[in-house]
Amino acid sequence: MFLLLPFDSLIVNLLGISLTVLFTLLLVFIIVPAIFGVSFGIRKLYMKTLLKIFAWATLRMERGAKEKNHQLYKPYTNGIIAKDPTSLEEEIKEIRRSGSSKALDNTPEFELSDIFYFCRKGMETIMDDEVTKRFSAEELESWNLLSRTNYNFQYISLRLTVLWGLGVLIRYCFLLPLRIALAFTGISLLVVGTTVVGYLPNGRFKEFMSKHVHLMCYRICVRALTAIITYHDRENRPRNGGICVANHTSPIDVIILASDGYYAMVGQVHGGLMGVIQRAMVKACPHVWFERSEVKDRHLVHFIVSCILGTCINNTSVMMFKKGSFEIGATVYPVAIKYDPQFGDAFWNSSKYGMVTYLLRMMTSWAIVCSVWYLPPMTREADEDAVQFANRVKSAIARQGGLVDLLWDGGLKREKVKDTFKEEQQKLYSKMIVGNHKDRSRS
Amino acid sequence: MGAAHSASEEVRELEGKTGFSSDQIEQLHRRFKQLSGDQPTIRKENFNNVPDLELNPIRSKIVRAFFDNRNLRKGPSGLADEINFEDFLTIMSYFRPIDTTMDEEQVELSRKEKLRFLFHMYDSDSDGRITLEEYRNVVEELLSGNPHIEKESARSIADGAMMEAASVCMGQMEPDQVYEGITFEDFLKIWQGIDIETKMHVRFLNMETMALCH
């Protein structure tokens, strides 16, 4: 019993010292720079080191594979079906033409063969579906020491396993608590700060304080995720009175954009922790939070700038924006955000993971590396309508980020396909048949 | 991903039974898992996860075809509740492209199989005949959702087409002779000489370097 006492206090002392050291480090290297907006360059160094390690790991795996005379499994993401871009009309005409052993003037109005087209199309979509494919995470070519992205388990040697184990240790026992502490600090500062600022009388001072509180807290959050962001073309940054529009892969986009500029946000109301944060933010600055189904709030505001959100989609494509954001006649500043999946996959499949699981995944990855491109501003021309303008902005963003332009509306993932689309197909088909029918009755 | 010995044997067995290559089987297996949510079987509800399928007017017939015992070669009629991967491949194999290396007999067999699949789609009560009612049902489904076509027009279109089919199959009919329905032999007769093989298959992309981790 007595022998334990000195050890006890020793352990307690050690613990105390290490915690103090940790917090000092935290403060000096992370929070203080965040407040003032400077950077020590630690994260860039970290990224370079990691890249070297990943390259080595992939080399080892390839060597292992070569020894066994096999090839590494490279997932094929472009789909398995060669879809022919012919239209409904062309295909049906062709099918009927091939059945022209019947009398030429007696073109039947409806043939048993018409069902072929729909049958085949149906089978093709069951085998391989454009939209569902977009919603699964991208697959990597080199391994980033995260077991979630590895498909080649059998080529891992002992050295690699040790490295991987070390990686797990670092990520879960060192990085994770650090990040959680930072995130906690950042969020609580945000909530407290904005509430305090909310009590100030309206005026220039309030705006000034609000701006800095927001920026500071977002910068802390950025460091909490170890997000390494490269900004391009900062001269095109959104200015007062404009609308900032970006492609949306995850909730992290908001943090990334907001840490570089002071935005009033337009977004969907969330419950839980997000809801608390949202309500606090509103006190200091005119954000607008709406229910997803209601869209009348959009013309409320004296926007300073607003972020536009859509459904989370995989990084490789840009879905159609909600039409609403483009109907107000302001200048639009497009922003393209592209994540590098090598360090951590930022994609959030909301039907597979909840918010907390997603955040944990983010915080246990190595880092979030992304590039932000500020594109030159666009305004709606006199002869375009909202939809065309939206598409123009969307393709500019897609082109910049190297993302694939996709005409689908991301809302498909949640709701069933709108009946109008289904009707379009059927209308087209029936027009063809009724057209023939009418011709016959006239002759 | 199956790296175990038994899995590759299974693949070889499936290759033999259904005629797909091992690459294609692997791809289809991934798709199967995606549709079933990692379960070993698929039910009708799982097809709701394919948004593109909603656009198809005969969606319900296609989904039904997957569970049709006649297509699964499990019986003369009725529907299965759920299907496993082998059943899934069996249905998909009806849409395999015609292999250029097949001989004439095999081509003929393949063609018959494809037409039988189609026949089953029309003949929903499994009595071996496509009656006027069943035909009308298909036409209505294909034309459904269009407010400009009244039910009457859809019916008359179906009736007209049915008369065509009757004339091909039975020749001139007596005034009081009733045409009971299209049997499978009549169905084949209608399609004689017409090339349907190129229309009833799914075109797989040529996949390179897709070696599995055996």
UniProtKB/Swiss-Prot annotation, chain B:
Topology relative to the membrane: Lipid-anchor
SUPFAM superfamilies found in the cross-reference section: EF-hand
Residues that coordinate or bind Ca(2+): 123, 125, 127, 129, 134
Domain-related comment: Binds calcium via its EF-hands. Calcium-binding mediates a conformational change. Can also bind magnesium.
Biological role: Functions as an integral cofactor in cell pH regulation by controlling plasma membrane-type Na(+)/H(+) exchange activity. Promotes the maturation, transport, cell surface stability and exchange activity of SLC9A1/NHE1 at the plasma membrane. Promotes the induction of hematopoietic stem cell differentiation toward megakaryocytic lineage. Essential for the coupling of ERK cascade activation with the expression of ETS family genes in megakaryocytic differentiation. Also involved in granulocytic differentiation in a ERK-dependent manner. Inhibits the phosphatase activity of calcineurin.
Induction (UniProt): Up-regulated during granulocytic differentiation in a ERK-dependent manner (is mediated by activation of ERK) (at protein level). Up-regulated during the differentiation and maturation of primary megakaryocytes. Down-regulated during monocytic-macrophage differentiation in a ERK-dependent manner.
Residue span of region Disordered: 1-20
Gene3D superfamilies found in the cross-reference section: EF-hand (1.10.238.10)
A Pfam family per the record: EF-hand_6
SMART domains linked to this entry: EFh
Molecular function in Gene Ontology: calcium ion binding; magnesium ion binding; phosphatase inhibitor activity; protein homodimerization activity; protein kinase inhibitor activity
Keywords: Calcium, Cell membrane, Cell projection, Cytoplasm, Differentiation, Disulfide bond, Lipoprotein, Membrane, Metal-binding, Myristate, Nucleus, Protein kinase inhibitor, Protein transport, Transport
Localization (cell): Nucleus; Cytoplasm; Membrane; Cell membrane
The organism's taxonomic lineage, starting at the top: Eukaryota, Metazoa, Chordata, Craniata, Vertebrata
This protein's record includes keyword NADP: no
Cited PANTHER family: CALCINEURIN B HOMOLOGOUS PROTEIN 3 (PTHR46823)
Residue stretches of biased makeup (Basic and acidic residues): 7-16
GO CC aspect terms: cytoplasm; cytosol; lamellipodium; nucleoplasm; nucleus; plasma membrane; ruffle; ruffle membrane
The name this protein goes by in its record: Calcineurin B homologous protein 3
Family to which this protein belongs: Belongs to the calcineurin regulatory subunit family. CHP subfamily.
Expression tissues: Expressed in mature megakaryocytes and polymorphonuclear granulocytes (at protein level). Abundantly expressed in heart. Also expressed at a lower level in adult testis and salivary gland, and in the placenta.
Oligomeric and partner information: Monomer. Homodimer; disulfide-linked. Interacts with SLC9A1/NHE1; the interaction enables an optimal Na(+)/H(+) exchange activity.
Gene this chain is encoded by: TESC
One example of a Gene Ontology biological process annotation: positive regulation of DNA-templated transcription
Lipidation, N-myristoyl glycine type: 2
Domain EF-hand span(s) in chain numbering: 110-145
